[in-house]
Amino acid sequence: MGAMAPRTLLLLLAAALAPTQTRAGPHSMRYFETAVSRPGLEEPRYISVGYVDNKEFVRFDSDAENPRYEPRAPWMEQEGPEYWERETQKAKGQEQWFRVSLRNLLGYYNQSAGGSHTLQQMSGCDLGSDWRLLRGYLQFAYEGRDYIALNEDLKTWTAADMAAQITRRKWEQSGAAEHYKAYLEGECVEWLHRYLKNGNATLLRTDSPKAHVTHHPRSKGEVTLRCWALGFYPADITLTWQLNGEELTQDMELVETRPAGDGTFQKWASVVVPLGKEQNYTCRVYHEGLPEPLTLRWEPPPSTDSYMVIVAVLGVLGAMAIIGAVVAFVMKRRRNTGGKGGDYALAPGSQSSEMSLRDCKA
């Protein structure tokens, strides 16, 4: 099972990627599945994508030349042919289920079959620090909007509208919740254990964040301080701004944790402060890759005058060091020659240069 993602999948992605991980737990597995009907074509396009700890590890696309489940993470290549054949057959079964479901939904909503319609499913499970089931998920969306979802008790359903009530009644009569509950509590957990074991070098690693604060002028005597955390893994991280030691939860702008594209994540949090009061504000960074939380302030660059003074001092010190070295060398030569000038032989090929210099009189 799995998913793709045109813009309509953002609804499910936001819900599914919200839980983050620590190495002891929790860990997560998600499958996103999307079927899109196409005018003039009997079969919808079906795409399934699997994620472990927010990392893609398998994919199926019915429009591929040879539709099969394929590995999307190096550690999945250790699975044998029987695994891929079994998962491919499951995906093809799901493809047919989605085709029938799309047709039913057209009737529920009194829609024409001539347009393009989208049905999506997100399913998966989270493990706690004891590696037991923390929560199971099963959610459906139609045309990019919530349709029906299995509640956290894994026994009851929440239907989003009148059409979804039809599906809810059918599934209650057939005992669908019991079927999904058994999968989420059993097979989902067992496979997640297996994937975490196979991919432990990648999935169970810890990369500590690299953090810094940037300064952005605003109008009316204000500036924005932005605290950045880059290159961290896993995705679970906390950034907070403090004013004189007190947290500014209400006045802080915080973006969602984002993939960096290299297997790590990035995040920032900003706060607007009065110009000249920047040093009263500190950013705190909490991540399991850090031995202790980081505390950062904005570090103003040195002024031009200070910079010139530093350069001048360094220049004087450098010149003094060179002069000292020359004097020491000359004194040593004089001691070695009894106080007389040393014999300096010209380097080969330097005769003409020496003659021309000697003939240049004032």
From Swiss-Prot:
Q: Where is the signal peptide?
A: 1-24
Q: Which SMART domains match?
A: IGc1
Which residues are sugar-modified? N110, N200, N280
| Consequence recorded when altering K332R | In Ld KCST-less, strongly impairs ubiquitination
Q: Where is this region: Alpha-3?
A: 207-298
Q: Region Alpha-1: start and end of each range?
A: 25-114
Instruction: Topology check: give the Extracellular ranges.
Output: 25-309
Cite the record's note on assembly: Heterodimer of an alpha chain and a beta chain (beta-2-microglobulin). Interacts with murid herpesvirus 4 protein K3 (mK3).
| Name this protein carries in UniProt | H-2 class I histocompatibility antigen, D-B alpha chain
Top-level taxonomy: Eukaryota, Metazoa, Chordata, Craniata, Vertebrata
Q: Which gene encodes it?
A: H2-D1
